[in-house]
């Protein structure tokens, strides 16, 4: 994440928090430390950036749930996984930007799309939605700026 984009995200967050908490001095606002070195960090930065620009964005959790197996006396004897009910291959972020559905798959490092994710991408694009693979924050911001100016 370059300095300009990091500062831009910080400025957006300060503006939002100044409006929400007008009596708190800027120096005392609790600001988020954004980074894009991990998938979690990049997802958080992108989601925040979209929201702070006045659009809708949400993180999609596609992971199942771990459940304890218990005997009748309540003793835990193991764990089973309940599958997620979300669509297989769903993107990490679902957003609405300029009234259009935008799905963003976050990939950091050597991560690649699974076959299910490629099928999901085809389904979204065939339906008229926008699908984007974000590898780092700077390229996402570049895409975002072009997209909102169309």
Predicted features and spans:
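Catalytic phosphate/metal-binding cores of nucleic-acid and nucleotide-processing enzymes, i.e., regions
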Residues: 1-150
């Amino acid at each position: 994440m370059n300095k300009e984009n990091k500062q831009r995200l910080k400025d957006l967050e300060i503006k939002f928090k100044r409006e929400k908490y007008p009596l708190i001095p800027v120096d005392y606002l609790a600001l988020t430390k954004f980074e894009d070195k991990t998938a979690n960090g990049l997802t958080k930065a992108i989601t925040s950036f979209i929201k702070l620009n006045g659009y809708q964005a949400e993180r999609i959790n596609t992971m199942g749930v771990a459940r304890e197996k218990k005997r009748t006396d309540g003793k835990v004897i193991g764990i089973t996984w309940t599958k997620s009910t979300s669509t297989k291959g769903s993107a990490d972020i679902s957003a609405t930007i300029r009234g259009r559905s935008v799905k963003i798959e976050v990939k950091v490092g050597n991560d690649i799309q699974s076959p299910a994710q490629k099928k999901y991408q085809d389904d979204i694009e065939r339906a008229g939605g926008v699908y984007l693979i974000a590898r780092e924050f700077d390229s996402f911001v570049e895409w975002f700026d072009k997209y909102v100016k169309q």
